[in-house]
Amino acid sequence: EFELTPYLKDGENKLAVQVFKWTIGSWCEDQDFFRFSGIFRSVYLYMIPKTHLYDIKIRPQVAENLSCGTLELDLRSCGSGSVRIQLVERGRLDLAESRYETPEGTEVFALEEKMEGTLHVSREVADVKLWSAEEPYLYELRMEVYDAAGKMQEVVASKIGFRRFEMK
């Protein structure tokens, strides 16, 4: 990733990319036997607001009795403001139809926290529905980031599942 902000001017800008055939990572670029030159993978250009999340760690955990769970979040942000965190139960994913049981979802919880730097959130989820390959039950975690003036800056959504794996 590269920060381009200092090089941008108002109006139209031109982005030029120089591609080298051989790099330190040549072995990695050649592992699939692609012998092409140029850019052969996706390239993205993102505009990121001053107040935004730049690192998100999501840990859905299930209790030993498999009836309840805990959702732990570690969020790292730039700028100051607040974040609204919402967990929505989407239901079982119907793979044949590529849709959820309840497309609109059912809110499990929502909370709003002040945000500046690092934020740790831990929230219990009662009557948690477990995810498995046979029953792909998903939740949607939605994080809305607001700046200090209360204006929405970005929305980050992630599908998550609660499961427990152990060997006894």
Give the positions of each predicted feature.
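Beta-strand-rich binding/interaction modules
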Residues: 67-111, 119
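Accessory beta-strand-rich segments of carbohydrate-active enzymes
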Residues: 1-55, 78-80, 158-160
